[in-house]
């Protein structure tokens, strides 16, 4: 396998963070995601190719637009898929800690399983399962722009560079971190296409979640969004506060800043953004757009984005150590969001799908939150299901209801404590392994 083609079997699992690639195994017992969820869409997609936009290998960047004539609401979805910043991560030598689509985007990408099934937000419905019907959600019938990910730079890099094999064995890799250029060109296209936008939602998962916050200012200004009509939902792509060298995420931020030439991009943000602390994007958004609506979702035990954040920078760190740093950083983010009336969040503890990474992908099953969840008391042990030792004394807030209320203009703040509710849930025990086996 030639390094210059930059194909890695491990990188196939980099689609969401580092482990969401839809694939069907060979053999009679093969199961694909389409066999498990009643999802997907049949949109009449328009493929858009803008001259000068490129994937990491220099091939043409492409994105897709669904224009519903009856809608004035626009959703822009930034796809996830890991990240890379050196030879090991950009070549695939680092295994799962790499970036998606290193060989560009085929013309039928939008109809392939991963793009078609990945997002209930795009499809406008939480997909059903056997005995569980499909449920329409707040983004049903919206116009959609789907931004695939193929630049390894969370859609905001601005650097063409060469990565050399430190062992001197394999040939160098020429890598186009051109996410920012691609994103700006796409936003300008959308501005020309959609002239009368009512509500505007920019969102993304994993690497795309980072992009949703980092690009909100550019999107808002270029598309001329009315104040109070803008929404940003970051799914599992947090920019944690990292103001000094002691911060847990500081090494990651410094590394990508150099590799992707972030200084050339960050200068375009308002003065309320502190370029020495990427986590200040939370303050910038809240201050610059006090009437708009922002939200974060992610799991407290995410073992995907957390690995990208710490594993390469803390040699020898184990799973417990990774999650400890993640939860420390998450509390810093929560404290920062609590300072602003226009920031919401829904943070469940765990979901045994995709290493608890991403709340809004594939299905909303298990993405609910109950801040008062606890162990059952002894006298509740016989409550159904008897195999479930955890209980929500009130009611779970589902992702569907969270989105409906938040897009309706309300602020919601939900953080679950430690619990194993999802692990013991009978439905999750059936569906979770099936989904994971199809990833």
Regions found by a protein language model. Give the residues of each.
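N-terminal signal peptide c-region/cleavage motif recognized by signal peptidases
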Residues: 23-26
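Cleavable N-terminal signal peptides
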Residues: 17-18, 28
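C-terminal His-loop and adjacent cap/lid subdomain of alpha/beta-hydrolase
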Residues: 31-439
């Amino acid at each position: 396998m030639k390094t210059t083609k930059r194909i890695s079997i491990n990188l196939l699992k980099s689609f969401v963070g580092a482990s969401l690639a839809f694939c069907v195994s060979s053999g009679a017992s093969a199961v694909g995601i389409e066999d498990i969820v009643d999802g997907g869409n049949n949109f009449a997609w328009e493929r858009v190719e803008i001259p000068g936009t490129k994937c990491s290998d220099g091939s043409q960047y492409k994105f897709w637009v669904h224009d519903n004539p009856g809608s004035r609401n626009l959703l822009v979805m930034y796809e996830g898929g890991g990240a890379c910043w050196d030879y090991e991560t950009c070549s695939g030598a680092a295994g799962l800690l790499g970036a998606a689509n290193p060989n560009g985007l085929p013309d039928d990408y939008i109809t392939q399983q991963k793009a078609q099934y990945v997002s209930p937000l795009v499809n406008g419905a939480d997909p059903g399962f056997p005995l569980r019907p499909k449920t329409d959600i707040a983004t049903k019938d919206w116009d959609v722009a789907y931004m695939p990910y193929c630049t390894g730079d969370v859609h905001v890099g601005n650097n063409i560079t060469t990565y050399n094999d430190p062992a001197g064995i394999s040939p160098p890799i020429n890598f186009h971190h051109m996410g920012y250029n691609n994103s700006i060109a796409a936003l300008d296209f959308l501005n020309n296409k959609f002239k009368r936008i009512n509500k505007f939602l920019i969102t993304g998962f994993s690497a795309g979640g980072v992009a949703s916050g980092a690009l909100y200012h550019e999107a808002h200004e270029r598309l001329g969004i009315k104040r109070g009509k803008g929404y940003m939902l970051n799914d599992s792509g947090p920019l944690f506060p990292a103001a000094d060298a002691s911060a847990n995420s500081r090494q990651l931020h410094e590394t990508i800043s150099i590799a992707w030439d972030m200084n050339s991009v960050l200068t375009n943000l308002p003065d309320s953004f502190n370029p020495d602390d990427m986590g200040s994007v939370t303050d910038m958004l809240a201050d610059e757009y006090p009437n708009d609506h922002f939200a974060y979702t992610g799991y407290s035990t995410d073992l995907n984005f957390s690995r990208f954040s710490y594993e390469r920078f803390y040699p020898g760190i184990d799973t417990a150590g990774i999650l400890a740093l993640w939860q420390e950083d998450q509390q810093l983010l929560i404290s920062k969001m609590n300072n602003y009336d226009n920031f919401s969040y829904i943070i469940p503890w765990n979901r045994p799908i995709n290493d608890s990474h991403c709340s809004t992908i594939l299905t909303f099953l298990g993405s609910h939150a109950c801040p008062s969840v606890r162990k059952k008391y002894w006298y509740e042990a016989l409550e159904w299901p008897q195999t479930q030792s955890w209980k929500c004394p009130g009611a779970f807030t589902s992702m569907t209801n969270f989105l409906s209320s938040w897009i309706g203009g309300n602020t919601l703040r939900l953080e679950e404590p430690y619990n194993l509710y999802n692990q013991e849930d009978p439905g999750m025990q059936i569906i979770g392994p099936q989904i994971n086996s199809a990833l």
